[in-house]
Amino acid sequence: MRIGIKNILAGIVLLLSTCLVTAQPVIKTPAKSIKEFMNKRFGMFIHWGPVTLRGTEIGWSRGEQVPANEYDNLYKEFNPVLFNADAWVKAAKDAGMKYLTITAKHHDGFCLWPTAYSGYNIMNSSFKRDIVGELAKACKKQGITFCIYFTVLDWHDPDYPVHRKGKDTEGNMTAFVARMKNELRELITRYKPAMLWFDGYWETPWTTEYGKEIYSFIKSVDANVIVNNRLGKDFSGLSAPGAVGDFLTPEQTIGKLNMSEPWESCITIASQWAWKPNDTLKSLKQCIQTLVKSASGNGNLLFNVGPMMDGRIEARQVERLKEMGNWLKIYGESIYGTSGGPFVPVESYGATRKANKIYVHVFERKGDELKLPALPGVMIKKVYFLKGKPLTWKQDESGIILQLPSMP
């Protein structure tokens, strides 16, 4: 066994004599764009802003743990002098991540780029540097795909009618949406994101009609930009009448096996999206199994870190990500560019596939044998550990039995 397999999971390869046919997902953007995005399988999510000065949750702590007026003025103190875009992107690359998504604007309305359409932005903080721009440049330099998070609600904007734990206003959604388009045009044309990750759809001022309007606007600016499904309010499926977007986004949970619609789970490495002092970190086993279970379900994992107030990602988070990257250096073949299945993921195992290979990932060993469902019409040629010895196996009409070696 190689390092990491003993206590985390086993990667077993079934070499088939017949290739399996995979259903093609229904998509709204060019097929090439979606395919390239889904093949990446693993990305970094970054939630960051002035709220790190308090160590509470971004957006949601406004008017809760932090009084709204105090929260809205944190930007004046925000001066993350140790921020280094290259270091962030390197941490993502060392983790084996293929793309990065930054919260350009979260629900608190603070913009991490020098927008011309709101004074509540990074250039009016003590820092006065274009966070989004520096990250976009660093991603391009290091070969990481750059993506942007943007919310459709803004509890700071007087034109938005609902202000969480603050004074509600009558608002002006026409002006709000017009300004949103201007901000999105800036982000798309200036930073060239491959994907836009929307949020904030649930409040009553936002409607599916607004979502469709924004989706069409984005496509008019750049038809190749991928958009997640949070512009609309119908999540029964991408083809539903009220659905808007190109891929599904389960949050803090792993999506189920879905061969017809692309999806990406967003999950935190700790308990909170934004940085929290002494937050509980997921174990390496949890991190790797979260990634593998996502791929086994035919989805991507957008794994979140929250940088600290000084601009650095916590050293222990960087180290945990690097450990994931070390595992992927050995077993990445079973993750990148694969499809989920053909077996439905269960508690003890999941599977991915590519060409004439099935990669079986063992999460929990329950004996010396692993019983897999039958594969009608498919004949197995051999079974072996991805980076190790062959396994004894048996196939008949009732299923496939793998003999697992004894563990030291």
Labelled PLM ranges:
Residues Q24-P408:
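Mature catalytic domains of secreted/periplasmic carbohydrate-active enzymes
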Residues M1-V26:
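Bacterial Sec-dependent N-terminal signal peptides
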